[in-house]
């Protein structure tokens, strides 16, 4: 009789849990199926009066869509050593999960073999960058502007007097050709490479002038920090701890979401978050995320919402949990860039 009662109680709990889950799912889908006019008006008003809101909306309009172009993926893959990449993924050490190993190999290949860092461009006459001195900025040519270049850095060689141009291209396909740049160019092209491999990725923007990527690890069931400049995988602490970088806002952008992930990265040296009301920032990121998901099937929209909830719990823990720093990642200061450049940016670990 006791066994029967226990079984009956278990069945009741299971039915109640299933009913509750279905009710929760219906509520989630109802809330994410359409945009209320009041929310649209609130967003428009927020953008009118707040500079950071305007900047985030502008980033959303670009970063959430520029990497979602199937026509580019074949061009990208044709430019890479796929045989070598896949061979090392199959044979080499790394994470247990295949996709995580692939991301780690792409980080290695991109930094060690494919892309180069540019503090200063080479002098065309002398063939070296040692005597290049920054002399300001110029306007992009018509050809440079075709590739979303809005700024051209100018350098004069102190030996021969020649002036070199360093166009800051924002078109990732152009970067596939030039294969050089600083953190903006590195992140831009690496993001396109990740998407070309079908890897779910986010472009992660820091208000204090750094950018990197995140990938969703199906094995770890969470978003993982990825920085191609540093060849860094799942080391979100490196900016606050290793670089000693002061930061305020970190926002991640993808074709499916806009998310404030500051808690994941800012564990020390927190700058004041006084550029926007926290409630307004939370509203804005959720509103932009809702816009990105409106046309998705119900099941996908619900799955993404559940992932959001799990990430929110993870981020809440990131603020208070002690930061564990792997010994291999303990080097002080940023690895990419010249010593002077890193010191000027406050990223040298001092």
Curated annotation (Swiss-Prot):
It is found in: Cytoplasm. Keywords: Cytoplasm, Hydrolase, Metal-binding, Zinc. One of its GO terms (molecular function) is metal ion binding. Its cofactor is Zn(2+). The active site is at 183 (nucleophile), 210, 227. GO terms for biological process: protein quality control for misfolded or incompletely synthesized proteins; ubiquitin-dependent glycoprotein ERAD pathway. Residues 324-350 are annotated as: Disordered. Gene3D superfamilies: 2.20.25.10, 3.10.620.30. Substrate binds at residue 230. Its main location: cytoplasm. Disulfide bonds: none annotated. InterPro entries: Papain-like_cys_pep_sf (IPR038765), PNGase (IPR050883), Transglutaminase-like (IPR002931). Its EC number is 3.5.1.52. Residues 340-350 have a biased composition (Basic and acidic residues). GO terms for cellular component: cytosol; nucleus; PNGase complex. It catalyses: Hydrolysis of an N(4)-(acetyl-beta-D-glucosaminyl)asparagine residue in which the glucosamine residue may be further glycosylated, to yield a (substituted) N-acetyl-beta-D-glucosaminylamine and a peptide containing an aspartate residue. The keyword Transport does not apply. Zn(2+) binds at residues 123, 126, 157, 160. It comes from the Eukaryota. The keyword Cytoplasm applies. Specifically deglycosylates the denatured form of N-linked glycoproteins in the cytoplasm and assists their proteasome-mediated degradation. Cleaves the beta-aspartyl-glucosamine (GlcNAc) of the glycan and the amide side chain of Asn, converting Asn to Asp. Prefers proteins containing high-mannose over those bearing complex type oligosaccharides. Can recognize misfolded proteins in the endoplasmic reticulum that are exported to the cytosol to be destroyed and deglycosylate them, while it has no activity toward native proteins. This is Peptide-N(4)-(N-acetyl-beta-glucosaminyl)asparagine amidase. It comes from Eremothecium gossypii (strain ATCC 10895 / CBS 109.51 / FGSC 9923 / NRRL Y-1056). The gene is PNG1.
């Amino acid at each position: 009789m006791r066994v029967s009662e226990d079984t009956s109680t278990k069945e009741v709990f299971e039915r109640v849990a299933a009913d509750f889950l279905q009710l929760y799912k219906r509520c989630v889908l109802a809330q994410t199926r359409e945009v209320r006019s009041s929310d649209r008006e609130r967003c428009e008003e927020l953008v009118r009066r707040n500079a950071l809101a305007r900047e985030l909306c502008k980033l959303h309009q670009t970063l959430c869509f520029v990497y979602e172009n199937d026509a580019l993926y074949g061009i990208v893959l044709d430019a890479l050593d796929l045989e070598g990449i896949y061979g090392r993924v199959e044979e080499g050490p790394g994470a247990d999960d295949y996709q995580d190993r692939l991301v780690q190999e792409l980080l290695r290949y991109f930094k060690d073999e494919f892309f180069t860092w540019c503090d200063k461009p080479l002098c065309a006459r002398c063939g070296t960058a040692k005597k290049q001195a920054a002399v300001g900025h110029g306007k992009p040519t018509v050809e440079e502007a075709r590739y979303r270049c809005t700024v051209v850095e100018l350098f004069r060689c102190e030996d021969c007097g020649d002036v070199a141009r360093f166009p800051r291209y924002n078109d990732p396909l152009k970067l596939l050709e030039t294969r050089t740049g600083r953190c903006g160019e590195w992140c831009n092209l690496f993001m396109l490479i990740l998407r070309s491999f079908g890897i779910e990725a986010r472009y992660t923007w820091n208000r204090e002038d750094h950018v990197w990527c995140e990938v969703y690890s199906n094995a770890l069931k969470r978003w993982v920090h990825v920085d191609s400049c540093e060849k860094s995988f799942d080391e979100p602490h490196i900016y606050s701890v290793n670089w000693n970088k002061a930061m305020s806002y970190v926002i991640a952008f993808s074709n499916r979401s806009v998310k404030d992930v500051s808690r994941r990265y800012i564990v020390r040296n927190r700058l004041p978050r006084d550029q926007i009301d926290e409630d307004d920032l939370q509203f804005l990121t959720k509103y932009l995320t809702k816009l990105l998901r409106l046309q998705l099937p119900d099941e996908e929209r619900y799955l993404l919402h559940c992932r959001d909830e799990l990430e929110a719990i993870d981020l809440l823990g990131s603020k208070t949990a002690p930061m564990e720093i792997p010994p291999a990642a303990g080097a002080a200061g940023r690895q990419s860039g010249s010593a002077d450049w890193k010191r000027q940016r406050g990223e040298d670990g001092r």
